[in-house]
C-alpha cells in the first residue's frame, strides 16, 4: 500500500458565535489509507468504542475498505507510518449500524467486533500480543446456542478497558424499541469472558435504551441513555444516568442510591426531562472530569418547532450542600431549523458530538467536536469554560466531510489530552440501511487536535 505524508496543518478561522485568534488550536492529519468504503458512514459513526485505541506506544485502527473487507492497522505514536492488514472478514457496509469496535487488553491482544445490526455476534482476537493477524473467537455461546447466550441479535457492540486489565463488552440484545443492554466482562488472567448482566437496562419489550458508557481516569463507569418508544427517532425522550464504582457489577444513582437491576423506565434516574418530538438525537455522549463528576451531551430543541442546539448536562455541588446536583449548559442554536424523525440511519445537517472535559487546578473547560453542514461541512470545536459559559467556535479542518461523525481514541485523550479522531469523507442515505450511495473510495486518516 502506498502512503502519502501530509504536513502538519494549522487552522484558525473566525466563526460565530465568538472567535479567539490569540491562541488558535492546531490540528494534524495523519493519513492511513486511500481505499476506505465511503458509500455510507459505517467507518465514522459517532460514539463508537472504539475505532482507534492507543496502548503501550501503539495506536490501533480499523475500517472497511472498498471491497467491504475488515482492515486493521497500527502505528507507533511517534510515527505517521502504518502497518496495514486486510483480513479475511467482511461486513455489510450498506448499513451504517454495522460499525467496527476494537480494544487492546492488558497483554496487548487485540479484540474486535464488527458487522452487527440485529445479527449474530462476530468477534475475533489477535493470534499474539501486538499482532494484526486475527482469529475468530466465541465469547459465551456454544455452536448452535447463540440465542440462549443472547448472542443472536447483537447491535452497537462496544469495548471498554478497565484499570485492572480486564475488559467490558456491551451491546444491545434485540431490536429498536424492544432491546436490552447486555454487559460481559473479560478476565485478563483466565482470558475468558463471563456474563455480568443479561439485562442492565431493560426496555420491557416496549422500548429500548440508546446508551453511551465511559470509564473515567479514576475507574468509575458512567452510563447515560435516552429512551426510544418505537423505531421512529422522533419518539426519543429523556436523559438518564447511572454509575458503577466496582467495574460494572453494581450500579447506583449520582447520589449513591443503589439501583435494583435491571434498570427500567420507571426506575432510571432522569437527569434532564426531554419530551418526545423534540429532535432529541440518540445516543447521548457521557464523560467525566478529573473528580469523576459526569457530563452528558446531545442535541435537541427546546420546543417541538424550535431550532436544535447542543446541551451539556453536568453534575456539580454549586450550592455547597455536600452532594452534587444536575446543571445544564446550552450551546448556541445551529444556523437553521431541521426535522428529526423516521426510521434507519439518519443524515441530519449536524453530527453527533464528541464531548471532552479539561480539568485544571482552577477551572474546567468543555469541548464539543462535531460536523456542521451549515459551516461548510467542516470539523468544528465548540468550547466554553464551565464556570462562566462563553462559547468559542473554531474550525479544526476546512474540508467538507459529507456525513462524517467523530469518535474518540479515549486512551490518547486520557494519557496525552489529545483528541484523536478517525477522519473520512463519506456519504449516507437518509433513513436507508439497505442501499449505500455509489461513491468512490476515499482517504481515511486520523485527525489529532490538542485544545
Question: Model-derived features: where do they sit?
Answer:
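Non-catalytic N-terminal targeting/anchoring module and adjacent flexible stem/linker
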Residues: 1, 17-22
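Sec-dependent signal peptide recognition
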Residues: 1-7
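C-terminal motif of bacterial Sec signal peptides marking the signal peptidase cleavage site
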Residues: 12-14
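Extracellular, repeat-based ectodomains that mediate carbohydrate processing or recognition
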Residues: 21-451
Amino acid at each position: 500500500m502506498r502512503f502519502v505524508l501530509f504536513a502538519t496543518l494549522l487552522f484558525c478561522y473566525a466563526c460565530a458565535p465568538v472567535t479567539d485568534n490569540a491562541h488558535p488550536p492546531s490540528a494534524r492529519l495523519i493519513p492511513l489509507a486511500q481505499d476506505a468504503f465511503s458509500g455510507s458512514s459505517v467507518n465514522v459513526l459517532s460514539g463508537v468504542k472504539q475505532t482507534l485505541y492507543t496502548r503501550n506506544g501503539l495506536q490501533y485502527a480499523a475500517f472497511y475498505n472498498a471491497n467491504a473487507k475488515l482492515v486493521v492497522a497500527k502505528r507507533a505514536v511517534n510515527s505517521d507510518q502504518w502497518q496495514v492488514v486486510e483480513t479475511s472478514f467482511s461486513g455489510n457496509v450498506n448499513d451504517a449500524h454495522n460499525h467496527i469496535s476494537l480494544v487492546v487488553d492488558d497483554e496487548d491482544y487485540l479484540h474486535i467486533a464488527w458487522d452487527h445490526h440485529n445479527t449474530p455476534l462476530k468477534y475475533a482476537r489477535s493470534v499474539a500480543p501486538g499482532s494484526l493477524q486475527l482469529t475468530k473467537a466465541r465469547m459465551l455461546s456454544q455452536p448452535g446456542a447463540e440465542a440462549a447466550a443472547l448472542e443472536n441479535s447483537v447491535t452497537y457492540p462496544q469495548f471498554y478497558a478497565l484499570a485492572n486489565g480486564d475488559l467490558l463488552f456491551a451491546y444491545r440484545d434485540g431490536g429498536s424499541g424492544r432491546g436490552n443492554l447486555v454487559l460481559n466482562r473479560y478476565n485478563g488472567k483466565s482470558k475468558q469472558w463471563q456474563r455480568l448482566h443479561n439485562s442492565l437496562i431493560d426496555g420491557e419489550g416496549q422500548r429500548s435504551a440508546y446508551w453511551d458508557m465511559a470509564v473515567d481516569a479514576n475507574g468509575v463507569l458512567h452510563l447515560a441513555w435516552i429512551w426510544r418508544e418505537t423505531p421512529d427517532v422522533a419518539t426519543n425522550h429523556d436523559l438518564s444516568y447511572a454509575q458503577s464504582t466496582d467495574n460494572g457489577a453494581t450500579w447506583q444513582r449520582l447520589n449513591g442510591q443503589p439501583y435494583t437491576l435491571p434498570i427500567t423506565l420507571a426506575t432510571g434516574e432522569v437527569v434532564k426531562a426531554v419530551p418526545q418530538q423534540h429532535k432529541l438525537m440518540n445516543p447521548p455522549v457521557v464523560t467525566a472530569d478529573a473528580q469523576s463528576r459526569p457530563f452528558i451531551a446531545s442535541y435537541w430543541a427546546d420546543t417541538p418547532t424550535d431550532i436544535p442546539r447542543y446541551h451539556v448536562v453536568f453534575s456539580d455541588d454549586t450550592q455547597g450542600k455536600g452532594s452534587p446536583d444536575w446543571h445544564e449548559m446550552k450551546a448556541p442554536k445551529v444556523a437553521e431549523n431541521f426535522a428529526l424523525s423516521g426510521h434507519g440511519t439518519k443524515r441530519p445537517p449536524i453530527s453527533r458530538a464528541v464531548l471532552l472535559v479539561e480539568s485544571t487546578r482552577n477551572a474546567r473547560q468543555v469541548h464539543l467536536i462535531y460536523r456542521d453542514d451549515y459551516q461548510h461541512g467542516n470539523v468544528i470545536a465548540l468550547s466554553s469554560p464551565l464556570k462562566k459559559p462563553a462559547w468559542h467556535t473554531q474550525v479544526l479542518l476546512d474540508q467538507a466531510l459529507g456525513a462524517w461523525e467523530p469518535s474518540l481514541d479515549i486512551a490518547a485523550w486520557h494519557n496525552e489530552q489529545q483528541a484523536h479522531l478517525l477522519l473520512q469523507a463519506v456519504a449516507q442515505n437518509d433513513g436507508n440501511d439497505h442501499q449505500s450511495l455509489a461513491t468512490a473510495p476515499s482517504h481515511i486518516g486520523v485527525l489529532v487536535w490538542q485544545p
